[in-house]
């Protein structure tokens, strides 16, 4: 089996995370997984949703979108259609769930963090790139809030990262780009903590059902890839 990109089955795409990419947000990055590029910002506002008022806890929510020409053909903006699509809603909920798992909300105070992930170029794996990049922006945003004296303690419990895996031409592969994702027999999105726990495993068989041994092989491959992503996050944050 030869991957269209020429990568080995266990090989990630070239990945880069550029911090402080925009001027105004408390945390911001440009994350690049090969030709997939996403701007992730984290903005902090005082106050929480009504269901949390008076509890002394914070909240984090996420939004996700794609530029009209992030893909091969121009897409109409969802705002011009008057509603968000099901895929968009699913992805932004996934991003929010994943990043909330990184935090102790009781130490965030009554603050809300808004995570915005905007895909400027898509070549597969936009949701996993968004989670991995937004995690770095989140750490930077928390540092800003700490300097402002807005936190009750350190809300960061653990780091979070995500990657895609799949079965392509009968073999498990890591970090699918668009051509691979389009032709994969199975694709899986995996979100993990740096303690080794799973936050989310989303899997779909496009043709034949995948077998337990294939699932285990994909999870092992994802775990290895996410370990590499944690190393990259730590290196970027240490810079």
From Swiss-Prot:
EC number: 2.7.7.56
Top EC class, one word: transferase
PROSITE patterns: RIBONUCLEASE_PH
InterPro entries: ExoRNase_PH_dom1, ExoRNase_PH_dom2, ExoRNase_PH_dom2_sf, PNPase/RNase_PH_dom_sf, Ribosomal_Su5_D2-typ_SF, RNase_PH, RNase_PH_bac-type, RNase_PH_CS
Pfam families in the record: RNase_PH (PF01138), RNase_PH_C (PF03725)
Domain of life: Bacteria
Catalytic reaction list: tRNA(n+1) + phosphate = tRNA(n) + a ribonucleoside 5'-diphosphate
GO biological process: rRNA catabolic process; rRNA processing; tRNA processing
UniProt KW Disulfide bond keyword: no
CDD domains (UniProt xref): RNase_PH_bact
GO molecular function list: 3'-5'-RNA exonuclease activity; tRNA binding; tRNA nucleotidyltransferase activity
Keywords attached to this entry: Nucleotidyltransferase, RNA-binding, rRNA processing, Transferase, tRNA processing, tRNA-binding
Record's keyword annotation contains S-adenosyl-L-methionine: no
Residues annotated as binding phosphate: 87, 125-127
Subunit record text: Homohexameric ring arranged as a trimer of dimers.
HAMAP family tied to this protein: RNase_PH
Function of the molecule: Phosphorolytic 3'-5' exoribonuclease that plays an important role in tRNA 3'-end maturation. Removes nucleotide residues following the 3'-CCA terminus of tRNAs; can also add nucleotides to the ends of RNA molecules by using nucleoside diphosphates as substrates, but this may not be physiologically important. Probably plays a role in initiation of 16S rRNA degradation (leading to ribosome degradation) during starvation.
Family named by the database record: Belongs to the RNase PH family.
NCBIfam families named among the record's database cross-references: RNasePH
Protein name: Ribonuclease PH
Species of the source: Azotobacter vinelandii (strain DJ / ATCC BAA-1303)
